[in-house]
Amino acid sequence: MDYSYANVVPNFRLDGRLAIITGGSGGLAAVISRALLAQGADVALIDMNLERTKSAAKEVLGWGEETLKGEHASAIGQVSAWSCNIGDAEAVDATFSSINEHHGKIADLLINTAGYCENFPAETYPATNAESIMKVNGLGSFYVSQSFARPLIQNNLRGSIILIGSMSGTIVNDPQPQCMYNMSKAGVIHLVRSLACEWAKYNIRVNTLSPGYILTPLTRNVISGHTEMKEAWESKIPMKRMAEPKEFVGSILYLASETASSYTTGHNLVVDGGYECW
């Protein structure tokens, strides 16, 4: 048995790697992109609104230049911004190809945070809304995974896919009437298992990170002035609080690392403060 430092202590550095983050202008992507940049990765942000995504990319790079000084200065990578509807397979494929060409390397880390939730009672859920959320959350997760994996397979390169699921993919969180969101996230979790089995032979690991309630800017706006809603949510969490976005960074770095999680694939990592325990 080799007990050398490198063989025992996991390495979370991402030097030389290119990470694609969908939903790139969102609250969760903001902290994830900074963490990946700090670990030496190049980062490509994708979202629907190009100007908002460019602004997010500029903020991330500015943060890197200000924060990663001294011994880490040389580790600051590139940050690029792209516009794409992940529910459009052809657009996804073209965007991923452009990203690889722009950065001069093939992306080997994908983090899909894109997706949305909406509430309608099941008996009155509009068909067009149901189709739309399944196209983005469900098919979009497949399209980005497919376009990411193809060049890796063609060039015999390894990679890691992290699809953001939700605790709502395995439980029904009362009192929100969000059956189609729950269905879409359940689909993401099982998609991950399927892709993990198919692509293990190509050294492409596929995992789900399923959050509970996160205090993103959007969530803060929703609960602002609604004390009863906030208290109702938190009462069902054993830790009695919602998560800060930064509390998901460790899980992302674990699943991204080729040493820490080299034998982890097809897994649904739930980070929910214990919500599912009750």
Curated annotation (Swiss-Prot):
GO terms for molecular function: D-arabinitol 2-dehydrogenase activity. Pathway: Carbohydrate metabolism; D-arabinitol metabolism. Belongs to the short-chain dehydrogenases/reductases (SDR) family. CDD domains: MDH-like_SDR_c. It comes from the Eukaryota. The lineage of its organism: Eukaryota, Fungi, Dikarya, Ascomycota, Saccharomycotina. It catalyses: D-arabinitol + NAD(+) = D-ribulose + NADH + H(+). Its EC number is 1.1.1.250. The active site is at S166, Y181, K185. InterPro entries: NAD(P)-bd_dom_sf (IPR036291), Sc_DH/Rdtase_CS (IPR020904), SDR_fam (IPR002347). One of its GO terms (biological process) is arabitol metabolic process. This is D-arabinitol 2-dehydrogenase [ribulose-forming]. Keywords: NADP, Oxidoreductase. NADP(+) binds at L28, N49, Y181, K185, I214, T216.
